[in-house]
């Protein structure tokens, strides 16, 4: 029968994995951005300062401390702390609004008895009595006055071990620190025109925004770290802070050079690499105490992440090289624990990560130069793996760690089941880290490296952030692709082609001869014969069949098979839990969902049409599973599809998969199915009603839905090609014998052909109505 094509597609479509996802990605995301090259067009390269990329500071690099700056007089920005780092005692800083606030800070050494000293404040010599009773801590004291000729009063103070001090203008106040480290807190002085206060720093200083006040307080209390990530290596003038730094954008497509046919594109990309290790643990035969192999194997990982506001789909393949083989032999007895070989990666090993994403950079990655990358490092730690021996405490392989450091990048190709991806291979060298690994309850301990037993340590993936840059030779016309693999059709063009093809298919319905259709519906159409009418080569036909299978996997018919399998599994578990009538009825309704509809009739939110569609879909699958000699709706659907494919002038490899899938879902939407038991026919109509009638009388009577469900479970389902209304009309107007009625009820193709050859208008109208329902 012609419906064989649908069963073949259902069988073969489940072998498709990554390729159809990549095809979908390529066809739906094909935007291209060209950046004005500006002054770098002649020099080929932009002045790019490559770093780890635009990544979160908390996970990749330490926060950058703005400074140090040389002593100077300036108007510091509002809501920014000046972190002062004096090296000697004396005046640290001073500032005034020249109206009602003169404020200065002095630094006093530890262990200073009360003494009078002279300081130069605002150009005047001032005598100040100072002291510091602390034996170890330096003392910061604020000297403040409110008139130009007034006397200074002392405030604060701050006793400090790190010898750091902070001043900030904010909210009509001047803030400083007071108390004693490591528990110093902030205080303030009210002032007018605070934003115009000029500050003079007599020592090196840093600038920290108010949003990072907690970090500033940490520095005040505990001091700067021994090695801090600063903006400047040595103190520089504060005016350098106003210089605008031009950096490459995280995602940038730059036209380096261009001719009529080709152009060089520089792609700059921030990337997030996620990868994981895979392993193989093989147990030897015998009593269960011996393992033959614990080894690494390549691992694929597909994921999405956001880059510069755009969601990116990426695929990585992780593999290892330079593996070290270890073994453990607990003895020669059959019950002695043995691992014949377990693999460990160490400092002499390498990890390769092949990376591909759906951005424009990878679309034409064929002719490439100036490839460079900068990636962060990542530490990989081993987890605990228990070797389940029959008796006794389990030996446990635990620990081990290595860190991965970028060692280069090259072009590579990732191979999947159906396509190959031009990708980047990032090579990482390894260094061993703490802790070492061991096998508990054995003599193995204190070994360094990462064993293959549990290399991911219960993590879903490891993550590395960074960026790469390359220059690729691509066609000048963005609609073209470098000839390396099959080109990707832009989705908008595909939709236009499909719209034209649907119109053509619908118009062809009137050109189908019914006698030929019946003969064609009886042929066992397979994929090759279905597509053989396409004016193309055999190789192209094979490619079309593959594309159809990939697309058919996502059809509603294929999804119905999965849903039906779940329902049958639930029904089987329901029987095992309870032998009640409700459980049995639930089981019987696996094809029809009768029990669900009945029990939820008071609270259901789905419409009758939705329920009927679900029931019809289940009955369709049941009919496919129990193929009879009669003709069914899918035979007619496939025959019409074959006829239209042969007559079409617009089909190609891109539109055919969509058309075949749509035909399986949309052809003949109104379907009725029946079950025959002895002389009684039970039928589910397209309006959601169940009824029965005798073959002899053809008089309708309603019956229980549960009875229909029970019969569907045990009896073959038949397509109502000649439905009850047509059959009764035929009997009332022409009169038919019991055997003719039975043959029509069974959808016997021989009897159908006889009525069509006799030009019976009732049968012809019914078949024509089915053909006209074969629309997209």
From Swiss-Prot:
List residue numbers at the site (Binding to sialic acid): 101, 190
**Motif placement: DGE motif:** 308-310
Disulfide bridge map: 203-216, 318-380
> What are the leading ranks of the lineage?
Viruses, Riboviria, Orthornavirae, Duplornaviricota, Resentoviricetes
Q: Which intervals of the chain are annotated as region Spike body and stalk (antigen domain)?
A: 248-479
Coordinates of motif KID motif in the sequence?
Answer: 644-646
What family does the Swiss-Prot or TrEMBL record give for this protein? Belongs to the rotavirus VP4 family.
Q: Where is this region: Spike head?
A: 65-224
Motif YGL motif: residue span?
Answer: 448-450
Record-level GO cellular component terms: host cell endoplasmic reticulum-Golgi intermediate compartment; host cell plasma membrane; host cell rough endoplasmic reticulum; host cytoskeleton; membrane; viral outer capsid
Task: Specify the protein name.
Answer: Outer capsid protein VP4
**Species in which this protein is naturally found:** Rotavirus A (strain RVA/Cow/Canada/C486/1977/G6P6[1])
Segments forming a coiled coil: 484-518
Q: Which GO terms describe its biological process?
A: permeabilization of host organelle membrane involved in viral entry into host cell; virion attachment to host cell
Q: Give the start-end ranges of region Spike foot.
A: 510-776
For the site labelled Cleavage, the residues are 231-232, 241-242, 247-248
Keywords on record:
Capsid protein, Coiled coil, Disulfide bond, Hemagglutinin, Host cell membrane, Host cytoplasm, Host cytoskeleton, Host endoplasmic reticulum, Host membrane, Host-virus interaction, Membrane, Outer capsid protein, Viral attachment to host cell, Viral penetration into host cytoplasm, Viral penetration via permeabilization of host membrane, Virion, Virus entry into host cell
Q: Where in this protein does the record put region Hydrophobic? A: 389-409
């Amino acid at each position: 029968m012609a419906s064989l094509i649908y069963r073949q597609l259902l069988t073969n479509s489940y072998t498709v994995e990554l390729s159809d996802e990549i095809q979908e990605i390529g066809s739906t995301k094909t935007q291209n951005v060209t950046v004005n090259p500006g002054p770098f067009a002649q020099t080929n390269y932009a002045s790019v300062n490559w770093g780890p990329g635009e990544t979160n500071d908390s996970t990749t690099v330490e926060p950058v401390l703005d400074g140090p700056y040389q002593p100077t007089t300036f108007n510091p920005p509002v809501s920014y702390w000046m972190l002062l780092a004096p090296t000697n005692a004396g005046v640290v800083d001073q500032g005034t609004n020249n109206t009602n606030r003169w404020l200065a800070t002095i630094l006093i050494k530890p262990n200073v008895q009360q003494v009078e000293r002279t300081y130069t404040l605002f150009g005047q010599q001032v005598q100040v009595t100072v002291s510091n009773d602390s034996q170890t801590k330096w003392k910061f004291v604020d000297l403040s006055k409110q008139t130009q000729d007034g006397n200074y009063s002392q405030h604060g103070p701050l006793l400090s071990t790190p010898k750091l001090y902070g001043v900030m203008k904010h909210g009509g106040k001047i803030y400083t620190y007071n108390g004693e480290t490591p528990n110093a807190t902030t205080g303030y002085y009210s002032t007018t025109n605070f934003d115009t206060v000029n500050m003079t720093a007599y020592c090196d200083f840093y600038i920290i925004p108010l949003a990072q006040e907690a970090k500033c307080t940490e520095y005040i209390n505990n001091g700067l770290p021994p090695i801090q990530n600063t903006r400047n290596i040595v103190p520089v003038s504060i005016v350098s802070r106003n210089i605008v730094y031009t950096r490459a954008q995280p995602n940038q497509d730059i036209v380096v050079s261009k001719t009529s046919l080709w152009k060089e594109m520089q792609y700059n990309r921030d990337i997030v690499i996620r990868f994981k290790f895979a392993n193989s643990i093989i147990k030897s035969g015998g009593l269960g105490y011996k393992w033959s192999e614990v080894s690494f194997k390549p691992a694929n990982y597909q994921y999405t992440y956001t880059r510069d506001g755009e969601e990116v789909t990426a695929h990585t393949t992780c593999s290892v090289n330079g593996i070290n083989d270890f073994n453990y032999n607990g003895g020669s007895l059959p019950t002695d624990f043995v691992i014949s070989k377990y693999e460990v990666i160490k400092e002499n090993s390498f990890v390769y990560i092949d990376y591909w994403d759906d951005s424009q950079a990878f679309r034409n990655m064929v002719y490439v130069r100036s490839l460079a990358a900068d990636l962060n490092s990542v530490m990989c730690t081993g987890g605990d793996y228990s070797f389940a021996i029959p008796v006794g405490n389990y030996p446990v392989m635990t620990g081990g760690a290595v860190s991965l450091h970028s060692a280069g990048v090259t072009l590579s190709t990732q191979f999947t089941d159906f396509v190959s991806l031009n990708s980047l291979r990032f090579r990482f060298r390894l260094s061993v880290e703490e802790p070492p690994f061991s096998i508990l309850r054995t003599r193995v301990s204190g070994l360094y490296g990462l064993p293959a037993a549990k290399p991911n340590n219960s993590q879903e993936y490891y993550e590395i952030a960074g960026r790469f840059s390359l220059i690729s030779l691509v066609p000048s016309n963005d609609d073209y692709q470098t000839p390396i693999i099959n080109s990707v059709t832009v989705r908008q063009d595909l939709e236009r082609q499909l719209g034209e093809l649907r119109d053509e298919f619908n118009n062809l319905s009137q050109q189908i001869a019914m006698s030929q259709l019946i003969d064609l519906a009886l042929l066992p159409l397979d994929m090759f014969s279905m597509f053989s009418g396409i004016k193309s080569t055999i190789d192209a036909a094979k490619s079309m069949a593959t594309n159809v299978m990939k697309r058919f996997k996502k059809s509603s018919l294929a999804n119905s098979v999965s849903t039906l399998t779940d329902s049958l599994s639930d029904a089987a578990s329901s029987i095992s839990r309870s032998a009640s009538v409700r459980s049995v009825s639930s089981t019987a309704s696996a094809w029809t969902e009768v029990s669900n509809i009945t029990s939820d009739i008071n609270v259901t939110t789905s419409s009758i049409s939705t329920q009927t569609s679900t029931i019809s879909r289940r009955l369709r699958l049941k009919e496919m599973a129990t193929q009879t000699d009669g003709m069914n709706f899918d035979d007619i659907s496939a025959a019409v599809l074959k006829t239209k494919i042969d007559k079409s002038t617009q089909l190609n490899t891109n539109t055919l998969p969509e058309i075949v899938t749509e035909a399986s879902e949309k052809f003949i939407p109104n379907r009725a199915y029946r079950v025959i038991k002895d002389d009684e026919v039970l039928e589910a109509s397209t309006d959601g009603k169940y009824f029965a009638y005798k073959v002899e009388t053809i008089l309708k009577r309603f019956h229980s839905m549960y009875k229909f469900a029970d019969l569907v479970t045990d009896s073959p389902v038949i397509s109502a090609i000649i439905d009850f209304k047509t059959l009764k009309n035929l009997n009332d107007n022409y009169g038919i014998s019991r055997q003719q009625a039975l043959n029509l009820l069974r959808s016997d193709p021989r009897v159908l052909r006889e009525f069509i050859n006799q030009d019976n208008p009732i049968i012809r109208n019914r078949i024509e109505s089915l053909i006209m329902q074969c629309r997209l």
